[in-house]
């Protein structure tokens, strides 16, 4: 890089302090910045002088020198810079650098020269060494000139160094690629501009002022007040040219001298603009000495370097610029010199010198410590059309383009951190998702209420939120779209992270929609006629012009000194060369592109391998144990939570009930005269009104009638109402306090359960954690990473689900195993229990069988003993009651074959035995005795009555010698009930069979009446038992059918003979008639139903057979109305057996007995006539039924074999069953009961 500060002119630079003191301080702090922006600190800021000469106003100071010339030149709008965005620059910085570049690039060129760039870069205040390093980095093609991207890069590096950064030793690859791409794009677009005119050969902005003009044209800069001199000062002479027109440089106030400063020549040919802040290099490489420009006591002023003067010019004499008596030194200018110009200072009024007093508005002094001289006025040439002659000059900017970009403040703080701020894609994705969440209507606009509520959650104060809203709501619509909302959220996060909020929204944060809208607005504001040629080429509309001549890289160092050749002058060879050059360039670009692609592909493959390895490592990591709460604990927690709510609801209801109960209790304790009709008996307003009306009515009635009525007055009602209201308020206050206590308890329980709920169901604040949103939800990550996270979570979820399923399956299997084990244990216990019960049942059954056997054995023994005892008693009674005739016949009746029989054997027993010959004996004995009418004497009958009373007494229960266990005692009742049921069934079945047998016997007897049983056969032994059951004649029925004879003793039957007792012959009448008073009384009692026996018994043996009627053959056999009261049931005599021709016997059907006839008392009247015998069925007469004398003991007929004809059903039996309540008593007489003693009853009247 060409560096003029490293040449031999260093001493002048160092003494001057240009690079360190003069320029650096002028640029960075006071001199230069204050010279252009405000007045220097060394001058006295006095008010502008006012002049009274005419109506003209004083001229204001204007910018002078090179800056003025650059400002007048403007921007190079012909330069075509492609539309390309540099990522390392903000949009605002790139626009500023483009403006500066356009102002410095010469017309027709696309690059900025090193000399022009040096002047720009030196204003930064950096050292030449630093600037040299920056130039080396920016000049990528080593052309000595910079294109716009290279110039922008240089400005960016300068800005970084000013902000404290280091100069990089090499450019970043990304920055380098962007700059190279931008440079290539510019190179392809070169040649689109038209060539410059033929005669234009400008190289610098100053050439237009020095070339093409012989002499400088006069320029009016103001009015001169009338003075004694009145001649303006000549400001320049040309070589061989007419003097320059006088130039007015200011107004002169009237003085006592009345003459102004004379005109002096101040320069040679083409005097250039004076630099007031810097020096231009002289052609010889040396600088001019300082020119004395001050008055008395004033220091030298730096007025700038002057352009190179042509050789041969006459030297200009120096001009006095100070006060009176002070001679200014001549300023050497090399070969030629210029006369110093009057630029200010206090001028002494002197006619000899002709000095001109300065304007009062000019700075008039220097402060101590200032190294910069007085501020010079503009002395250069200004375009004559800039202002009117009567208007004052306006202050102009003195820098290139926008002068404020070069101020220290601009370089130091003109690039705030917010300029580089922009929204990242991750932030956009996150903020857009939040916007879509709240934009439920899908309108694309978020209302200010919703957006303000979202912003308020950040915790910023109101002023900051208002400032953020003003920044993001660019169009003041009160609503935010997606981009504006994202900008607002971005500013909120930056403020939370400690960054300051910008005063204006940076261009990088301006939403694209707002930028487009603003551009459209600006285009609409500008008319179509004033539109300029577009400064950028649209990439879509770009079309390469191959006919244009493009500069090569080798001639970029050169400038176009000659006009470009016309298209017509191009030859075919030149075009071929251009085509070949383009082809080579394309090939090189392709090769470089392929190399870059290969390198990028290798890097991508390596990156992918690394990513795959990381993914594999992540997948291979052991999964975190699922710390989920067991399902039973979770279910328990849920149940407790729900039960707590239920409990609180119940408590609230109970509290309400308690409150109502208290109110009701108060009303009961303090009864009111007002009857409430509201809910729960509450007193309503209507009830109160009604009570008041009632009280008023009662008071009026009392006043009318004069009688007091005891009714509560209105005051009493109000007092009661007030008391009730106070009590109700008190009760409600207590209820409210209780409710508050319950609410506190509920809140405490909620606080305790909240951590548990968070642990079970996860945290509810996880969405506020950016890391959670990033790595759990995948917000702000690349799509591949998001997919990987999603798949990883799915894998973890599946693994957890499988683990939970396995755990549940194991728990289910364990539960089933426990259930099976429990079932097996229960089954085993049940089997053991059943076995034990069966064993107990068998033991009980065996014990019961043994007990039954023992009981039967004991009962049999007792029965035998009782039968023997009864037999003995009967024998004894018969023996005592035997008549002398019987004693006389006793030896005759004795059978020689039975010598061992005692006197107790009676004919009655023989008759009974004879009657039972044909009945098979089953070993059953029927206890009982004869009837009362069987005894003739009173003593025998009294003995009979005593015997029957003794028999009626219950026998002592048999004592069991075996101790029963508790279980036998428990089953005793059940066993007895079962036995009773079985006995009833057997009884019904036996009765049914007996009825069937009776029916069959009656049928057989009616069919074969010829065969009858002869009474003579009773003494004989039966040949064989008959298949047809033969019912024996009951002694009771026999006694009922027999009437006592008058004039004879007790009837006596001889079983072996029938000669005297034939039923077919008339019986002999006794001479005397006996009447038994007791027998008649007994008969009468039986007829009247006064007997104690009811004919029912629980004995199965006695009640199993139906009572059969006794067949009678004579009228004398009148049956009794009932059986003996001591007997369980009257035993009917069996029908008379009829012997058939085939040897079988038929039973005669029973004959209905006639009603009993009372016997008259003993008298000597005629005997009672006996009716003839009743006719038998089918014209046959049954044989006479033998009369059996009553005996003391009558054996019960044996059970006959039952005929089973297949009908086992006993439900249709019409036989009355014994009630279950009637239980048989063990030990009682199962056969007969004794008749109690009967008091003496007078005999009935005799029969007619």
From Swiss-Prot:
Biased composition (Polar residues): 316-337, 916-928, 946-964, 1023-1037, 1105-1123
Domain EH: 93-182, 427-516
InterPro entries listed in its UniProt record: DUF1720 (IPR013182), EF-hand-dom_pair (IPR011992), EF_Hand_1_Ca_BS (IPR018247), EF_hand_dom (IPR002048), EH_dom (IPR000261)
Comp. bias regions, Pro residues: 1150-1161, 1239-1248
Domain of life: Eukaryota
Keywords: Actin-binding, Calcium, Cell membrane, Coiled coil, Cytoplasm, Cytoskeleton, Endocytosis, Endosome, Membrane, Metal-binding, Repeat
Topological relation to the membrane, as annotated: Peripheral membrane protein
Residue ranges of coiled coil: 566-601, 713-746, 787-879, 965-997
Bias type Low complexity, positions: 800-817, 834-868, 904-915
GO cellular component, one term: actin cortical patch
Family: Belongs to the PAN1 family.
Subunit description: Component of the PAN1 actin cytoskeleton-regulatory complex.
Protein's recorded name: Actin cytoskeleton-regulatory complex protein PAN1
């Amino acid at each position: 890089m060409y560096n003029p500060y490293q040449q031999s002119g260093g001493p002048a630079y160092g003494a001057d302090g240009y690079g360190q003191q003069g320029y650096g301080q002028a640029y960075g702090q006071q001199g230069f910045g204050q010279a252009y922006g405000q007045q220097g600190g060394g001058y006295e800021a006095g008010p502008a002088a006012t002049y009274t000469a005419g109506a003209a106003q004083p001229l204001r100071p204007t910018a002078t020198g090179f800056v003025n010339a650059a400002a007048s030149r403007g921007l190079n709008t012909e330069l075509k810079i492609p539309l390309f965005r540099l990522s390392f620059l903000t949009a605002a910085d790139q626009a500023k650098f483009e403006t500066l570049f356009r102002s410095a690039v010469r017309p027709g060129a696309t690059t900025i020269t090193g000399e022009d760039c040096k002047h720009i870069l030196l204003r930064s205040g950096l050292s030449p060494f630093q600037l040299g390093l920056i130039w080396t980095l920016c000049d990528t093609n080593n052309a000595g000139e910079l294109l716009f991207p290279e110039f922008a890069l240089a400005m960016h590096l300068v800005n970084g160094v000013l902000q404290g950064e280091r100069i990089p030793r090499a450019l970043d690859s990304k920055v380098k690629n962007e700059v190279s791409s931008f440079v290539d794009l510019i190179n392809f677009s070169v040649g689109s501009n038209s060539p410059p005119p033929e005669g234009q050969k400008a190289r610098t902005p100053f050439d237009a002022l020095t070339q093409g003009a012989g002499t400088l044209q006069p320029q009016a800069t103001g009015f001169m007040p009338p003075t004694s001199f009145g001649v303006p000062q000549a400001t320049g002479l040309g070589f061989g040219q007419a003097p320059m027109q006088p130039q007015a440089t200011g107004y002169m106030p009237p003085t006592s001298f009345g003459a102004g400063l004379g005109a002096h020549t101040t320069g040679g040919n083409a005097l250039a603009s004076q630099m007031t802040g810097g020096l231009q290099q002289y052609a010889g490489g040396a600088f001019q000495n300082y020119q004395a420009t001050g008055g008395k006591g004033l220091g030298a002023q730096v007025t700038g370097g002057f352009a190179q003067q042509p050789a041969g010019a006459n030297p200009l004499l120096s001009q006095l610029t100070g006060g009176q008596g002070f001679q200014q030194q001549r300023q050497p200018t090399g070969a030629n010199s210029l006369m110093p110009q009057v630029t200010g200072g206090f001028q002494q009024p002197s006619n000899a010198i002709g000095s001109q007093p300065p304007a009062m508005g000019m700075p008039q002094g220097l402060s101590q410590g200032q190294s910069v001289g007085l501020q010079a006025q503009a002395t250069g040439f200004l375009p004559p059309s800039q202002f009117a002659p009567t208007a004052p000059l306006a202050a102009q900017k003195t820098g290139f383009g926008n002068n404020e970009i070069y101020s220290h403040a601009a370089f130091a703080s003109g690039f705030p951190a917010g300029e580089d701020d922009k929204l990242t894609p991750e932030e956009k994705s996150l903020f857009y998702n939040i916007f879509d969440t709240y934009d439920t209507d899908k309108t694309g606009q978020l209302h200010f209420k919703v957006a303000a509520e979202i912003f308020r959650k950040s915790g910023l104060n109101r002023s900051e939120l208002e400032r953020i809203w003003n920044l993001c709501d660019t169009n003041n619509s009160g609503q935010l779209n997606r981009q504006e909302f994202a900008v607002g959220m971005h500013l909120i996060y930056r403020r939370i992270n400690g960054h300051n909020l910008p005063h204006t929204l940076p261009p990088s944060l301006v939403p694209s929609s707002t930028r487009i809208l603003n551009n459209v607005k600006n285009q609409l504001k500008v008319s179509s006629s004033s539109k300029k040629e577009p400064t950028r080429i649209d990439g879509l509309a770009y079309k390469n012009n191959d006919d244009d001549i493009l500069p090569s890289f080798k001639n970029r160092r050169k400038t176009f000194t000659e006009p470009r050749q016309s298209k017509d002058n191009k030859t075919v060879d030149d075009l071929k060369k251009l085509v070949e050059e383009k082809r080579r360039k394309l090939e090189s670009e392709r090769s470089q592109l392929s190399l870059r692609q290969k390198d990028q592909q290798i890097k991508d493959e390596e990156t992918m391998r690394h990513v795959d390895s990381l993914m594999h490592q992540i997948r291979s990591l052991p999964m975190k144990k699922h710390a989920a709460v067991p399902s039973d604990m979770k279910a328990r927690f849920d149940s407790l939570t729900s039960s707590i709510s239920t409990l609180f609801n119940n408590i609230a209801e109970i509290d309400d009930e308690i409150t109502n109960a208290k109110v009701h209790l108060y009303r009961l304790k303090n009864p009111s005269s007002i009857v409430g009709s509201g809910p729960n008996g509450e007193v309503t307003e209507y009830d109160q009104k009604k009570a008041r009306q009632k009280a008023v009515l009662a008071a009026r009635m009392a006043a009318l009638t004069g009688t007091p009525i005891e009714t509560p007055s209105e005051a009493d009602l109000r007092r009661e109402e007030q008391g009730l209201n106070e009590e109700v308020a008190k009760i409600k206050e207590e209820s409210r306090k209780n409710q508050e206590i319950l609410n506190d308890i509920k809140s405490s329980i909620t606080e305790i359960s909240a951590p548990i709920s968070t642990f079970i169901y996860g945290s509810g604040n996880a969405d506020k954690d950016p890391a959670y949103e990033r790595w759990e939800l995948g917000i702000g990550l690349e799509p591949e990473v998001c997919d990987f996270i999603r798949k990883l979570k799915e894998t973890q979820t599946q693994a957890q689900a499988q683990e939970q399923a396995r755990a549940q399956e194991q728990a289910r299997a364990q539960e089933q195993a426990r259930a099976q084990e429990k079932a097996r244990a229960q089954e085993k216990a049940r089997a053991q229990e059943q076995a034990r019960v069966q064993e107990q049942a068998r033991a009980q059954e065996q014990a019961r069988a043994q007990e039954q056997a023992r009981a039967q054995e004991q009962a049999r023994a007792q029965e035998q003993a009782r039968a023997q005892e009864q037999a003995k008693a009967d024998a004894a009674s018969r023996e005592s009651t035997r008549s002398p005739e019987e004693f006389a016949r006793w030896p005759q009746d004795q059978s020689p074959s039975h010598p061992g029989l005692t006197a107790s054997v009676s004919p009655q027993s023989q008759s009974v035995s004879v009657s039972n010959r044909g009945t098979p004996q089953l070993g059953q004995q029927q206890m009982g005795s004869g009837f009362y009418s069987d005894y003739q004497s009173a003593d025998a009958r009294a003995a009979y009555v005593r015997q029957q009373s003794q028999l009626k007494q219950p026998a002592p229960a048999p004592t069991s010698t075996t101790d029963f266990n508790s279980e036998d005692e428990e089953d005793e009742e059940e066993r007895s009930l079962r036995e009773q049921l079985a006995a009833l069934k057997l009884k019904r079945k036996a009765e049914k069979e007996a009825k069937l047998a009776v029916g069959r016997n009656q049928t057989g007897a009616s069919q074969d009446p010829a065969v009858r049983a002869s009474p003579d056969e009773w003494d004989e032994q039966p040949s064989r038992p008959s298949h047809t059951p033969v019912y024996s004649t009951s002694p009771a029925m026999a006694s009922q059918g027999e009437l006592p004879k008058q004039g004879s003793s007790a009837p006596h039957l001889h079983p072996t003979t029938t000669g005297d007792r034939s039923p077919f012959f008339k019986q002999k009448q006794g001479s005397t008639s006996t009447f038994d008073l007791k027998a008649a009384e007994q008969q009468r009692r039986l007829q009247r139903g006064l007997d104690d026996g009811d004919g029912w018994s629980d004995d199965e043996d006695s009640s199993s057979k139906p009572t059969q009627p006794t067949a009678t053959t004579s009228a004398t056999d009148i049956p009794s109305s009932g059986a003996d009261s001591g007997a369980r049931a009257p035993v009917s005599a069996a029908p008379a057996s009829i012997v058939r021709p085939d040897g079988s016997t038929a039973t005669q059907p029973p004959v209905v007995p006639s009603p009993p006839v009372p016997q008259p008392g003993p008298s000597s009247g005629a005997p009672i006539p006996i009716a003839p015998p009743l006719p038998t069925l089918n014209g046959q007469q049954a044989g006479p039924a033998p009369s059996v004398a009553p005996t003391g003991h009558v054996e019960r007929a044996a059970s006959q074999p039952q005929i089973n004809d297949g009908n086992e059903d006993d439900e249709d039996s019409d036989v009355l069953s014994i009630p279950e309540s009637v239980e048989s008593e063990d030990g009682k007489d199962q056969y007969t009961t004794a008749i109690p003693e009967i008091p003496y009853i007078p005999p009935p009247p005799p029969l007619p």
